[in-house]
Amino acid sequence: MKKIILSAVALLSLLALFGCNNRAEVQALQPASYAELTPMQQSWRGVLPCADCAGIETSLFLEKDGTWVMNERYQGAKVPTVIASWGTWARTADKLVLTDSDGEKRYFHARGEQLEMLDSEGKAISSSFNYTLSPVKASLPTTPIAMKGMYFYMAEAAVFTDCATGRRFAVSSNAQLERDYAAARDGEQKPVLLVAQAHFSLEPNPESGAMQKTLVVGSHSRFESNKDCRD
């Protein structure tokens, strides 16, 4: 009986370690904590197969706040194309699940120190081509990402709340953006919808000095007064 109990405890501990439970996958997905991420690299790069180009140079960055950024450069394309995307990530027992800002999912599987891309249903791809990303040390990409959210500025600090995910980010200091916001809010101290081309960066927190994920808003951005995320 003692052996049975010990075996049961060991099994439960193993299941807890890998985040397994008997719910459906959608219910099981939770933003992973930093402790869960520790055994994995935080950034990867590789060239993934492409149907109509030489390959897709792919860089993936996982952040401790449960978000990710991906940069994809299409090699040998007739028109140079670079696409940046972002969203939230979560772990299941055997998969890394990336959900982008439009709700679309991409799946990867940890194989040693590498990440192996899975198909659209989260299953292994049977192919002679290389679908793996290798660990690297790299900075966040500066390729602009189309974003929409509520911008609020007060006490010399700006915050952007993304419409698609509800995530909040500090905004890098931008005098022109602050002037545009002042004009758009029409004298009221309120959030205003911002449609932006932006990228993420790591910048020191003005108060603590600790590095934090910050949104850098580009010049091709605009405020839309009297609108919100529902519009």
For each feature predicted by the language model, list its residue ranges.
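Bacterial N-terminal signal peptides that target proteins for export
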Residues: 1-8
